[in-house]
Amino acid sequence: MSDLESSSSSSSDEEELERCREAALPAWGLEQRPRGPEKPGVDATNAKLPANQPSLMHKVDEHEQDGNELQTTPEFRAHVAKKLGALLDSSITISEIVKEPRKSEVQQGALEDDGFRLFFTSIPGGPEKEAAPQPCRKRLPSSSSSDDGDEELRRCREAAVSASDILQESAIHGHVSVEKKKKRKLKKKAKKEDSADVAATATSKAEVGRQEKESAQLNGDQAPPGTKKKKRKKKTKKASEASLSPPTKSAAAVPSN
């Protein structure tokens, strides 16, 4: 088996080297060597060549030019290798990215010892850490003594409400509501009466003023009786003053003669 594997690996290497050389040959100047019938590609693991069948690939040592078909010098090959290396270095970039641990991974690492959480509000820890539920206490049966019976009866009487109490309370509330309605109606009626009285007084005042204007227009320039009395008083006062003034003038004129 080792001989078969070594022969298969050497044949695959030779095939690959031959293909590279054929690809490197230019299309002019040199004639390509005749090639044998191509075999379908076989995987290296499944390639099992028999020991008695020789390989059809040309060996490098058997070439006439000792593997140097292009007749190149070592300096030229070094120069080409240097250029290719510079080209590859310029086109290839190596990025060093430090991957930060995710939050989920951190939480998972922190909770490895405590298990996992089913919900967000779950408390970490096993079931042994949870407090055991307290057992429900059963209600003790009531004693049949007379004191307990009397006390229970008293509580029932306090909690019980008779139908008469309910009717009485509803009647009181109903009476209060009726009285409130009556008071509201009386207030509304009083407001209406006050507004009617105000309107009546306003109309009466307007009617009196209108009548006075009409009477003044009918009488024309005649003055009212009050103004006549004032004029009479002024006339009598002037007459009394005129009657008192002549004797003083005559008394003053006598010494001049």
Swiss-Prot record:
Residues 32-41 have a biased composition (Basic and acidic residues). Residues 1-72, 120-157, 170-257 are annotated as: Disordered. It comes from the Eukaryota. One of its GO terms (cellular component) is nuclear envelope. Residues 180-190, 227-237 have a biased composition (Basic residues). Residues 1-11 have a biased composition (Low complexity). InterPro entries: CUSTOS. A motif (Nucleolar localization signal (NLS)) lies at residues 228-236. It is found in: Nucleus envelope. The modification Phosphothreonine is found at residue 73. GO terms for biological process: negative regulation of Wnt signaling pathway; Spemann organizer formation; Wnt signaling pathway. Keywords: Developmental protein, Nucleus, Phosphoprotein, Wnt signaling pathway. It holds the Pfam family CUSTOS. The modification Phosphoserine is found at residue 55. Plays a role in the regulation of Wnt signaling pathway during early development. Belongs to the CUSTOS family. This is Protein CUSTOS. It comes from Bos taurus (Bovine).
